[in-house]
Amino acid sequence: MPTAFPEDSVGLVSPQVFRFSEPLALACGRSLAEYELVVETYGELNAARSNAVLICHALSGHHHAAGYHSPNDRKPGWWDSCIGPGKPIDTNKFFVVSLNNLGGCNGSTGPSSANPATGKPYGADFPVMTVEDWVHSQARLADVLGIEQWAAVIGGSLGGMQALQWSISYPERVRHCLAIASAPKLSAQNIAFNEVARQAILTDPEFHGGHFQERGVIPKRGLMLARMVGHITYLSDDAMGEKFGRGLKSEKLNYDFHSVEFQVESYLRYQGEEFSGRFDANTYLLMTKALDYFDPAAAHDGDLARTLAVAKADFCLMSFTTDWRFSPARSREIVDALTAAKKNVCYLEIDAPQGHDAFLMPIPRYLQAFGSYMKRIEV
């Protein structure tokens, strides 16, 4: 537990709540009459309001991207390795905004929030969200903050999809777009993984059609299984082999179906158990559907270059060699489309054994490349 924070930490941070009363029309045909977004900021907004950077989170992410909420916190925010003084997203230079998206379960309005119409948790009645919906809500947040244009919009995985959507939906409001370990749309295999995870939740007897909160229960087993499946896809075979191999938890096999015998089994069960205690099942369903639905090129008969033709930002794409969830080939699809659309783009394929989760890790080559690009951004 830190008693003094590292010099390159943003230190103690406090979330802010922004309330919106103007209805937000959604892609599903419904709307949210009112909603709240939980936000953290790091660094200072300059007088010209030209140094603001938006951080978009991935599936299980949230607003707490850097720093500590308490001196007793065991861990900093989820992207602390990249945000702070002297780090790639340098808070001595940039004013950084990070939020929990609508539909999340970390304070922003979502399935676990009270439905104003009933006074009960929304549960399964919360509307399905899309990446476009999130970007529109983020644009409203920017308006409230007085930010007309982002110096950069940055995200990894699902966050990278939001960054791309920003460049399409609000081309005048983004100077640089950084999409890391991302994709222009999900493959059939990725949709399949998400469906297996959803079925694990939907078929849990404690799910109760999404209204489990009213019964005082949670679909723990379903969430555990969903997280276990997802976590396998976030790591590479090499990373799992190096970390666990075929190591046993105890010295011998038990020859039964109930014991936790292999170290990798123990790890997955721990991850599932921890996740099911902090994440909302309806939010998990919602986030995976937003991933599945993301396909901006569909508006132009699948032509991604035509879709990106409206963008005015400069782009930086990064991928990792062992990421098989969003492989380098998926980032190259975006690069090829941007090149065809005659946009400024740089692409970095980073040799890293960690798989998809590499974008969250303090890999020196990655941090150096990331920081080099961010230094080019004028504020």
From Swiss-Prot:
GO MF annotation terms: homoserine O-acetyltransferase activity; homoserine O-succinyltransferase activity
SUPFAM superfamilies associated with the record: alpha/beta-Hydrolases (SSF53474)
Binding site for substrate: R227, D357
Site (Important for acyl-CoA specificity): R325
Function: Transfers a succinyl group from succinyl-CoA to L-homoserine, forming succinyl-L-homoserine.
Family: Belongs to the AB hydrolase superfamily. MetX family.
Record-given protein name: Homoserine O-succinyltransferase
Organism: Ectopseudomonas mendocina (strain ymp) (Pseudomonas mendocina)
Classification of source organism: Bacteria, Pseudomonadati, Pseudomonadota, Gammaproteobacteria, Pseudomonadales
